[in-house]
């Protein structure tokens, strides 16, 4: 796992941004799976969020975690959930980003039980700003790195863009930067920023 922290003005709570940087890698001597959509895209979003908060000092500490082992049964996130740098009880919200480089106008998401209390804020922001045609909320599943935290009562949301033109390259050797679609990159970034600002203004 690779972890960065941007210190906020307060240290009693924090936000956490996660994405896995591993992929399938090599298969034999000649076959290589690049993993641009899955999940260089999500990793790029959390790096952009980190750059934003370096320039704009946040109210609370921010943790940016690039997990390894997601494609090996969530090993990296499971380990971190058992050995967190800050108590899990201090997490105001965790955002997990996986496969963002597609062009489906509806954004797939999963929300933990504890995250549902503030989920209407995501819907309100999206309705006002029109970032996505809709937020397509699905049942919580153990398919990405938010899951170990959801099981430990952390408020979290998982964003993934699937079903567009890039999805046909999922887990293939053609998941390359040439097939990377950036149209939902900024809307995802902006929705998260607006959510944090909206949560702060309501405190």
Residue map of PLM features:
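Acidic/His- and Gly-rich active-site-bordering loop/insert found
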Residues: 1-27
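Sec/Tat-exported extracytoplasmic proteins
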Residues: 6, 19, 25, 50-57, ...
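Short, glycine-/Ser/Thr-/acidic-enriched flexible segments
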Residues: 9, 22, 69, 101, ...
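Loop/turn elements at helix/coil->beta-strand transitions in domains of secreted/extracellular proteins
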Residues: 11-15, 58-62, 89-93, 130, ...
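Generic beta-strand/beta-sheet core signal
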Residues: 18, 65-67, 97, 157-160
């Amino acid at each position: 796992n690779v972890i960065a922290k941007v210190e906020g003005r307060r240290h009693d709570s924090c936000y956490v941004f996660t994405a896995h940087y591993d992929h399938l890698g090599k298969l034999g001597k000649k076959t290589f799976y690049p993993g641009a959509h899955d999940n260089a895209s999500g990793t790029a979003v959390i790096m952009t969020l980190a750059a934003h908060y370096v320039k704009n000092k946040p109210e609370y500490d921010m943790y940016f975690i690039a997990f390894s082992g997601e494609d090996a049964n969530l090993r990296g996130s499971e380990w971190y959930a058992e050995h967190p740098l800050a108590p899990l009880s201090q997490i105001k919200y965790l955002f997990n980003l996986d496969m963002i480089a597609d062009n489906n106008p509806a954004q797939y998401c999963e929300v933990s039980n504890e995250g549902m209390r503030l989920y209407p804020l995501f819907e309100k922001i999206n309705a006002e700003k029109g970032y996505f045609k809709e937020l397509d909320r699905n049942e919580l599943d153990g398919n990405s790195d938010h899951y170990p935290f959801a099981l430990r009562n952390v408020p979290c949301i998982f964003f993934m863009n699937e079903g567009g033109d890039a999805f046909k390259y999922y887990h293939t050797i053609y998941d390359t930067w040439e097939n990377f679609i950036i149209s939902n990159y900024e809307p995802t970034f902006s929705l998260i920023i607006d959510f944090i600002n909206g949560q702060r203004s309501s405190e």
